[in-house]
A protein has these predicted regions:
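Active-site phosphate-binding/coordination module
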Residues: 58-164
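Short, structured coil segments at secondary-structure junctions
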Residues: 92-94, 101-102, 110, 216-217, ...
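Long, intrinsically disordered low-complexity tandem-repeat segments
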Residues: 1-29
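Mg2+-dependent phosphoryl-transfer enzymes with acidic/Ser/Thr/Gly-rich catalytic loops
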Residues: 35-40, 56-57, 214, 230-311
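Short, acidic loop-to-helix structural element flanking the phosphoryl-transfer center
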Residues: 54-70, 117-124, 179-183, 235-247, ...
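Conserved acidic, metal-coordinating active-site core of Asp-based
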Residues: 131, 138-259
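Asp-based phosphoryl-transfer active-site loop
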Residues: 37-52
C-alpha cells in the first residue's frame, strides 16, 4: 500500500472513531445565519426519541421538558397513530400537537381533534392490500383507520416471524385489533385509511412490491424498518405536515428543528430549519441533515438539544 493510501485509510479510520464517540458536525456553523431561534421541535419516535426497548431515556425527557419551559412547541412526529404516542411524552406541558401516521394526520393531542389530514380513500387501500394478498410472496399487511390498527386474525400472531425485536413486536401488536378479514372490514366500514403497513421476510419481495407501488402516483411509499413498507396517500409526509403545523402556529420554517433516523423522516429533515439525524439513521437521512447526533441508544436527542437550544 502506498504511503498516500495509508494516510487516507488512517483518516477514514479516524473519522469513523469520531462518528462513534462524538456528535458529528456537518458544517452547521455555516448555516447559523439561515435559521432563527428554535420555536418548534419535531421528533420522530422509533429509532430516534425512544431506545431499542421502546423506552424514552430520562435524559431525553428532561431536555424536552427544559425546552417546553422556554415556550418551545414539542411535536411528536411519527409513523404511529395518536394512541401510539408515549403517555409520558404527552404529559409534558409543551406537547399539544402531533404529526402522526407519517404526516397523514396532524392532531391536537389535548383536544383529540384533527387539524389536517391526507388519507387514502378506502377503495384505493383495498386495492393495494389485495395486491399484497395476491402477489405470491410471504407478505403481512394491515391498515390504520381513524387511529386504530386493523389486521386479520391470520396475521396477528405472526409478527415474531417478521420482526426480531421483542419490544417492537409488543408495540405493534398492542396497536392493532384482529378481525376475521380486515380487507373486508375496511371495505364495509371505512371511508378513508390513514396508512397501510406491509412486512416482508424477504428483501427481494420487498423491492418487488416497492417497484409495483411506485408505479401508482396516488401513493407515497416509505419505510421505517428494513423489513417494512409504509404506504400513505401522495402528499402525506412528515415534512409537509411540519410546514402546515408551523404555519398554523405562526412559526417560521427557519425556527423549526426536526429529529429522525428513517426513510419516512427524510422529508421532515429536509424541510426543517435545522434537520438532525441520528447516528443510527439510514445514510440518506444523515446525508440530508445539517447535523448528526448520537444514536437513539445514547440519548442523541438530548445531546443535540443541549448543543443548539439549551446553550
Amino acid at each position: 500500500m502506498k504511503i498516500a493510501d495509508m494516510e487516507i485509510a488512517d483518516m477514514k479510520i479516524a473519522d469513523m472513531k469520531i462518528a462513534d464517540k462524538e456528535i458529528t458536525d456537518k458544517g452547521i456553523a455555516d448555516k447559523r445565519g439561515a435559521y432563527k431561534e428554535i420555536k418548534l421541535i419535531a421528533v420522530d419516535m422509533d429509532g430516534t426519541l425512544v431506545d431499542d426497548e421502546k423506552r424514552i431515556p430520562e435524559e431525553n425527557l428532561r431536555a424536552l421538558e427544559a425546552c417546553a419551559a422556554k415556550g418551545i412547541e414539542i411535536v411528536p412526529a411519527t409513523g404511529r397513530t395518536v394512541q401510539g404516542v408515549p403517555k409520558e411524552l404527552k404529559a409534558l406541558p409543551g406537547v399539544r400537537y402531533g404529526i402522526t401516521v407519517n404526516g397523514a394526520v396532524v392532531a391536537d393531542l389535548k383536544e383529540n381533534r384533527v387539524i389536517s389530514s391526507c388519507r387514502l380513500p378506502a377503495g384505493l387501500a383495498v386495492q393495494v392490500m389485495t395486491m399484497a394478498r395476491d402477489c405470491g410472496d410471504d407478505v403481512m399487511y394491515d391498515a390504520y383507520v381513524d387511529g386504530v390498527g386493523y389486521t386479520s386474525e391470520c396475521f396477528y400472531g405472526r409478527f415474531p416471524q417478521f420482526i426480531q425485536s421483542e419490544a417492537l413486536v409488543r408495540l405493534l401488536m398492542s396497536a392493532r385489533q384482529a378481525v376475521p378479514d380486515h380487507i373486508a372490514w375496511i371495505r364495509e366500514n371505512a371511508s378513508y385509511v390513514d396508512k397501510i403497513n406491509m412486512f416482508f421476510r424477504d428483501q427481494d419481495a420487498r423491492e418487488r412490491m416497492r417497484e409495483r407501488l411506485g408505479q401508482m402516483p396516488e401513493l407515497l411509499v416509505s419505510s421505517s424498518l428494513s423489513c417494512n413498507l409504509e404506504i400513505n396517500a401522495a402528499g402525506a409526509d412528515k415534512g409537509g405536515a411540519l410546514i402546515r403545523l408551523a404555519d398554523f402556529l405562526g412559526i417560521a420554517r427557519e425556527s423549526t428543528m426536526a429529529f429522525g433516523d428513517g426513510e419516512n423522516d427524510l422529508s421532515m429533515i429536509r424541510q426543517a430549519g435545522l434537520g438532525v439525524a441520528m447516528a443510527n439513521g439510514v445514510p440518506a437521512v444523515k446525508e440530508a441533515a445539517e447535523y448528526v447526533t448520537l444514536s437513539n441508544e445514547e440519548a442523541g436527542v438530548a445531546a443535540a438539544i443541549r448543543r443548539f437550544v439549551l446553550k
